[in-house]
Each structure stands twice: as C-alpha cells, then as structure tokens.
UniProtKB/Swiss-Prot annotation:
Entry's EC annotation: 4.2.1.17, 5.1.2.3, 1.1.1.35
Subunit organization: Heterotetramer of two alpha chains (FadJ) and two beta chains (FadI).
Species the sequence originates in: Escherichia coli O81 (strain ED1a)
Region (3-hydroxyacyl-CoA dehydrogenase): 306-714
Family matches, as Pfam families: 3HCDH, 3HCDH_N, ECH_1
Family of the protein in this entry: In the N-terminal section; belongs to the enoyl-CoA hydratase/isomerase family. In the central section; belongs to the 3-hydroxyacyl-CoA dehydrogenase family.
Gene from which the chain derives: fadJ
GO BP field: fatty acid beta-oxidation
Keyword terms, alphabetized: Cytoplasm, Fatty acid metabolism, Isomerase, Lipid degradation, Lipid metabolism, Lyase, Multifunctional enzyme, NAD, Oxidoreductase
Job of this protein: Catalyzes the formation of a hydroxyacyl-CoA by addition of water on enoyl-CoA. Also exhibits 3-hydroxyacyl-CoA epimerase and 3-hydroxyacyl-CoA dehydrogenase activities.
Name by which UniProt lists this protein: Fatty acid oxidation complex subunit alpha
Region feature (Enoyl-CoA hydratase): 1-190
Length: 714
C-alpha cells in the first residue's frame, strides 16, 4: 500500500498552485529524506504547466508550518560523508524550489523552524500570521549542528549578516512582528486571511529584495566583515568556553559564503554539517533532545490523571509568586493564592504583573492578553474560594509542623478529591503526610528558582501516594511548561542530593586556599552556566546550605561541609545577592559591571586565596563527586532511569548539555576511567571520593549505563 504523500498539489482556478504540507499521522510537520521525491514530482508538474502564475506552500497542521527536519535522519548516518550527502540533498531541493520561474510564496502559521525556515527562505516571498504560535528560527546550534539546507547562506543575504549571525548562533526564535521588521517576512496578517494574502503576493512579480540597512551593508563589506567576525568570534568564545564546536563552524561557513560566494558557502555548509553531526557534542545534545521529548510524553504512572480545572497556592513569597505565574499564564488555569498577610498576596500578584508587563514592553504580548491572564490570579487571607480546587501547591517556610498543619487545613477546607502538593526542597514527603486523613493525595512538587525560567520539576510520591495523584501532578507540571521527573522520597531527592557534594567540594577548596574566581571560572570552563560559589550567591547562601545538615544526617560524613565555614559566612549576615552581601561584591542595582570577589571573605573563613590547583583539577574534584552521587541515586532507585538522571542534572542544575548528563558523561569516559580517577582522588583527599559499588562493578564488567540506541537501561 502506497504511503500518503506529505506534499500535495492543487491548482486553483486563478492558476495559483497550492502545495499543502501535511505529514501523515504526525502532529508536527518534519522534513524527511523520503519527501524529496514527492517535492521533485510536484516541481516537475509546476514546470510543465505554463499557465501557472504562482505557487504557495501552506501547512494543513493547526499550529505548525514545518517544525524542522527529522533528527533521526542524522542518527542514521554512520559517517560525516553520509551526513554531508544529506545536507547536499537538502540544498539541492531548496535550490530547485528557488529556481522556479514563477513567484513561490511560503504561507506560515505556527512554528517555522530549522529546515522549515530554510524551505521558506528558498521561496521568493513569505507571509506569516500574527498568532503567538508563529515563530521563525534556526535552532540547529542547540543540537550541536548548523543549518544544512542553505540557511547559513540565504539568511545573511536577506536580513543582513549581523542579525543573521545572532539568529544562527543562538537559535533565537522571532515572532511575527520582529520577523517583518527585519525583512524576514514580507507581510503579517490574521490567520483567517493567510492563504489569500499569500495568493495575492504570488500573483505579483517576485517580491524585490528589500535593501539592507546601511549598517548591515557596511558589515557585509570586507573591512566591516573582518571587524564583525572578530568581535562576534570573541564574544561567542567567551560564551561557549570553546565547548561547542558548532558556533565556530557557523562563523566560518557564513564568512566563507560572503567572502568567496554562495557556491563556496554551500559547499562549506554541507561539509561542516557532516563533520558536526559526528561530534560527541552533537550526539550528546541530540540525546538530550530525545530524552526530554520522551520525558514529556511520560505520564508518570499507569493511572489516568484526574481533571484539572483550578489550582490553589499557599504562600505568596518568591516561589509561590512564580508558581502562580506559570500556573495561570502557562497552564491557563485559575489560581487562588492564600497568604496570612495581604502583602504576600500583593507580592505574588506583582510578580506576575512584572513578568507580563515585561512581555508587553517587548511587544511579545498585547495589553489585553496581559489583563486576561492576570484575571486568572486572585488572593485571599483565608480559605475562601478553595472549596473546589483540584490541586493545592504549598510554598510556605521549610518547617515540618507548619507543612503538616497546611495538610490538615486543606483537608478541612477543600474537596475530598483535592491533591496536596508540597514544594519542599528538603523535608520528607512521608513526614509531611504523616498525620494526613488522605495520605494518598499528598505528593511533593519541587520547583527550582526562578520558577518561570527553570525547566525542571521533581515530583516526589511517598510510600502511600496513589498512582492517580502522581499522574495528575505530572499533568499539571507539563501544563505549566515544565519537564517533570518522578523521584523517590529520600533526603535531598535527586537534584539537591547530587548538587550538595559539588558545592561542598568547592567550599572545601576555598578553605584550602583556592581563589573564588578561579573555582568558578574552572567550572564555567568545564561547561556549567555559573560556578558553584556564584550559584550559592544567586540562590542565597542560607537557602543553598540548608539542605547540607539534612543530607549529612541521612547519608553520613561524605556530605559534611568544611567545619565552621558556612556558619562564619552566615553569622556575618552574608546571604548572597538577595541582601547584597555574599562571596561577591554587589554594586548599585541595574549596574552591569564585572563581578568582583569580596576580599573580606578570605580572612573571615581563615583562607589565604593563594591556590595551587589548575582549572581541570578544580573541576575534576567537584564533578567526580556529583557523578558518584548520581550513580548512588540510580542504585537506590531515587531516579527511575538513567534518562531521568541525565535530564534532571541538565535541566535542574545546568550540567553541561554537550556532555549529555552525568550518565552519558560516565559512559563517554568509561566506568573504569571514572573509578581510577576517584581512587586517585580518594588517596589524595579522603574517603569521600571512594567510588560507589555500582561504579566499581561496572568498571570490572566493562559495562555502560546507556545502550548504543536511544533507549535507557533501567
């Protein structure tokens, strides 16, 4: 039986050809290699029909034009040459579309990304809808690749080299208004008239290319170009720390096309695409992509989730305000905040106002839409309006008795089906549910700060939590735009447990005489977004160290922090950025200056700041402890799979994505190498570096955590 075509041709009475894109059986249109023959057959028909006046590409999907190329195609390539051939095939197809003698227009609604935007760029004109779902971008760099079907050559010529570089190097996505302003699209229209607007454009002569702004014309010249690429190269190197080869190749390929012409540019693009596809960085980033896609599809349990119509939040502080924002503005659910103090409610409302007003100022949101979303949030100082809430998220102080009291109050004031979800970061969920009348409806829902930015949540069922409670909480987290992992109710859960030894070791090196900026720079060079000491300042030194005694009580001295260091810092009223006193100096608000260490820290903790370790030695000590603890978490079934362990570390603490997560990284080094490093460190620095039994066993057997396919071991 012949497979239904993803591309179908219909010719209207006015001799405009409509090519409809609709990949059978898929929610998203993605480009596959086998579609090339379908498109070529259509191009042949178009060339043979001399009556045609124009062509329009349009999607039949309700919320996407083309979301990109199918990434599995790259995984199927065994060599750089095979991946290069794939890119050349894409380039050739786009060239054939562009070579049609009549106007070809892309009618864009929804996501137009990667290969989808490259197809749109090959058209002679583009019209898109003003819908918030419509975004245009080239996100290949986030997979360790570059656009391989002509994007690196067409985009700079259309919108200018500096703007194109920003899009390609960051994977930045543009909304409709930004796209038309930059000249990426020719018109923005309501969805209802998209096709007709594209048809009208197709009836005209080919849209003439918009003259580039003077600045872009100067930067395209030899002198301006040399200056631009030097400046962008320096900035990119600082940002990536040399850990992402794709950025360097993007700069090289774009410059080749501008300096030597498009033919050389396309050649360089295809070659670079093939070589990048084989890099360990790209393979790791693609694995993270596949794993996060799997996690988003995981229901958390076998039971069907209960309906979610409205949510309540206890506590209007920083976390409560952030949770209210993602619940109302991302999940679209009515939220009622209870706080004993009206100021707490006002704080939470202002939190959402500030987030939404920022979007209005950046023209990402209409004022009317802001008001509509804010109307979903209300507040109260008692339980008025809580009677029929389906799920209550508790975000009060980390105090067990207080949280137990919250459970009792919710059970008295809410419906019998209401789920109680605690945002605790350190208290056992089983203890919070200890006196509950309905313990099966108590669960942990651990968000990370800042809530609106951090993609991960940990969902923590205790021994009596029902399967439906798990499924419903997972469903809510996904609605909030989060990536949820289900973890076991053990001290520190997963993320904080693997983070604590990493932070502790950084503090220990500080007491040994290593400089703060050296420790942080070493871990940033390794691939973390910020160093461990700066991270403590950002989350709050008091908040970040609160978990340490809990973990030490549960797991012993391997979690003990260097004696008296943390207490000395806290006793000096140093809480980090939030009170302007931490390891670093904080100037006036809004000033963007290079971070400087507060020199008063060293005498305070009795350290000299005269370190002897190299950056790789510093990183090794912090990271090895994190890897060892991650393996222990898998062994104790704190995490359900290595997939969840990798996603939790990358999305929860910024473990370097190009390494693929702790378990992928151990596999890339080899368990034997990790054990050898840890045994050496144990000899040098103490028993906390002793590799766990699972690692030693895997080393002896030559085993790895992941199979060679994209499925995990469990």
């Amino acid at each position: 039986m012949e497979m239904a075509s993803a591309f179908t041709l219909n010719v209207r009475l006015d001799n405009i050809a409509i090519i409809t894109i609709d990949v059978p059986g898929e929610k998203m249109n993605t480009l596959k290699a086998e579609f090339a023959s379908q498109v070529r057959a259509i191009i042949k028909q178009l060339r043979e029909n001399k009556e045609l006046r124009g062509v329009v590409f349009v999607s039949a999907k309700p919320d996407n034009f083309i979301a990109g190329a199918d990434i599995n195609m790259i995984g199927n390539c065994k060599t750089a040459q095979e991946a290069e051939v794939l890119a050349r095939q894409g380039q050739q197809l786009m060239a054939e579309i562009h070579a049609l003698p009549i106007p070809v227009i892309a009618a864009i609604h929804g996501a137009c990304l990667g290969g989808g935007l490259e197809l749109a760029l090959a058209c002679h004109g583009r019209v898109c809808t003003d819908d918030p779902k419509t975004v245009l971008g080239l996100p290949e760099v986030q997979l360790g690749l570059l656009p391989g079907s002509g994007g690196t050559q067409r985009l700079p010529r259309l919108i200018g080299v500096s703007t194109a570089l920003e899009m390609i190097l960051t994977g930045k996505q543009l909304r409709a208004k930004q796209a038309v302003k930059l000249g990426l699209v020719d018109d923005v229209v309501p969805h209802s008239i998209l096709l007709e607007a594209a048809v009208e454009l197709a009836k005209q002569d080919r849209p003439s290319s918009r003259p580039l702004p003077v600045r872009e014309r100067i930067l395209a010249g030899p002198l301006g170009r040399a200056l631009l690429f030097k400046m962008v190269g320096k900035k990119t190197e600082h940002k990536t720390q040399g850990n992402y080869p794709a950025t360097e190749r993007i700069l090289e390929v774009v410059e080749t096309g501008l300096a030597q012409g498009t033919s050389s540019g396309y050649d360089a693009e295809a070659r670079a695409f093939g070589e990048l596809a084989m890099t360990p960085q790209s393979q790791a980033l693609r694995n993270i992509f596949f794993a996060s896609t799997e996690v988003k599809k995981d229901p958390g349990s076998d039971a069907p989730p209960a309906p979610l119509n409205s949510v309540g939040i206890l506590g209007g502080g920083l976390m409560g305000g952030g949770i209210a924002y993602v619940t109302a503005c991302k999940a679209g659910l009515p939220v009622r905040i209870k706080d004993i103090n009206p100021r707490g409610i006002n704080h939470a409302l202002k939190y959402s106002w500030d987030q939404l007003e920022g979007k209005v100022r950046r023209r990402h949101l209409k004022a009317s839409e802001r008001d509509k979303q804010l109307a979903l949030i209300s507040g109260t100082t008692d339980y008025c309006g809580f009677a029929h809430r389906d799920l209550i998220i508790e975000a009060v102080f980390e105090n067990l008795e207080l949280k137990q009291q919250m459970v009792a109050e919710v059970e008295q004031n809410c419906a019998t089906h209401t789920i109680f979800a605690s945002n605790t970061s350190s208290l056992p969920i089983g203890d919070i549910a200890a006196h509950a009348a309905r313990p099966e409806q108590v669960i942990g829902l651990h968000f990370f700060s800042p809530v609106e930015k951090m993609p991960l949540v940990e969902i923590i069922p205790h021994a009596s939590t029902s399967a439906q409670t798990i499924a419903t909480t997972v469903k809510l987290a996904k609605k909030q735009g989060k990536t949820p992992i289900v973890v076991r109710d053990k001290a520190g859960f997963y993320v904080n447990r693997i983070l604590a030894p990493y932070i502790n070791e950084a503090i220990r090196m500080l007491t040994e005489g290593e400089r703060i900026e050296h420790i942080d720079a070493a871990l940033v060079k390794f691939g973390f977004p910020v160093g461990p000491i700066q991270l403590l300042d950002e989350v709050g030194i008091d908040t970040g160290t609160k978990i340490i005694p809990v973990l030490e009580a549960a797991y012993g001295e391997r979690f003990s922090a260097p004696a008296n260091v943390v207490s000395s810092i806290l006793n000096d009223d140093r809480k980090g950025r939030k009170n302007g006193r931490g390891f670093y100096l904080y100037g006036q608000k809004g000033r963007k200056s290079k971070k400087q260490v507060d020199p008063a820290i060293y005498p305070l903790i009795g350290a000299q700041g005269q370190g002897r370790l190299s950056a790789p030695q510093v990183a090794e000590r912090c990271v090895m402890l994190m890897l060892n603890e991650a393996v222990r978490c898998l062994d104790e079934q704190v995490i359900r799979s290595v997939r969840d362990g990798d996603i939790g570390a990358v999305f929860g603490i910024g473990f370097p994505p190009f390494l693929g997560g702790p378990f992928r990284y151990i596999d890339s080094l080899g368990a034997g190498e990790v054990v050898a490093i840890m045994q050496r460190l144990a000899t040098q620095y103490g028993s906390r570096f002793t590799p766990c039994d699972r690692l030693v066993e895997m080393s002896e057997r030559g085993e790895s955590f992941w199979k060679t396919t994209a499925t995990d071991l469990q």
